[in-house]
Amino acid sequence: MLNKEQLQTIIKLQAELDLKIVQTKMIEESQDVLTAKFLALLVEIGEFANEQRCFKYWSSKPASSKAVLLEEYIDGLHFIISIANNLKLNLSDLKIVEQKYDNLNLAFLDLFSETLALAKEKNLSIINQWFNIYYTIAKLCDFSGDDIFNGYLDKNKINHLRQEQNY
């Protein structure tokens, strides 16, 4: 998983991107923006699951490439870090513990559940459990901490460019 330095860098970069979006789009931070971020996170988790294809029992087509899966994983990471920044939750205090799952379907279902719980309760203990699950999914997908960190840096650059191009 990410080391503390990598996580702190991501938190800082996400705060800078969020500020740029607010300024570029002239958005007033409000509960509506936070609600939109939670919905966006759920959508990104769904897109990740869709590319993973673990739930598609009717299909013999394999999961998308590791690069595609990592990109979807990173999209979810962008939103959860943005949400944590919004809520002023100190992610440096996270205690990540790998979870045990018989299959990815159960992990994704738990991740959806924790996302909805976080949208209601907005506390560090729920976000810690969210990260436990997300970390476990990363391991099951064979993503290293460096894969995640470098993937985040690449996507962050793309997101800044998109803002500059009036995305």
Predicted stretch roles:
Residues M1-Y167:
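Flexible "arm" and connector segments at domain edges
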